Amino acid sequence: MKSITQRLENVVKLQAKRWENEDYWDDINDLLIKELEDILALEPQNTSALINLGAVLSDSGENENALKILKTAVDLGSEDKNLYTNIAIVMVDLGINPEHYHEYLETAENFTENPLTFKAFFDPNAY
C-alpha cells in the first residue's frame, strides 16, 4: 500500500497531466477528487490534500466549496504558499473585493510552496 506522501506525489503528477490532456480533463478531475477524498477519509486534517482538493474544485468552478475547504486548511495552521494563493484565486473568481484577497496574497509571500500541493488555475486576462 502506498503512503499518503506517495499518493500526494501522484496527485501532483496527475494534476499536471490535466493540462497536457484536455480531452480527458473531466475524467482526470474525477480521479483527482476521488483520490483526494480517499486521502482525507484516512487523514481528515491533511492540509496538502485539502489544498489540492480546493484547487481542483476551483478549477471546476466550484468556488464556494473550494473556499470552504481551503479555509479549513488555514484553520489547521497550514503555512503553504499555495494555500494562500489559491484562496486569493478563488476570491477573485467569486468577485470578492480586491482588498480582501490582497491580504491572502501578502500572506502567501511569507511562505514557501509545499511540493505536495499545487496552485489553482488563474487567467489574469479573464478579468
Show the residue positions of the predicted features:
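Short coil turns that delineate tetratricopeptide repeat
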Residues: P44, S78, T112-E113
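Alpha-helical tetratricopeptide repeat
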Residues: I4-E20, I33, T47, I51-N52, ...
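Alpha-solenoid helical repeat scaffolds
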Residues: I51-N52, N82-I87, H102-E103, L116-D123
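Single-residue signature of alpha-solenoid repeat helices
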Residues: L32, A66, H100-Y101
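A conserved position within tetratricopeptide repeats
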Residues: E37-L40, V74, A108-E109, L116
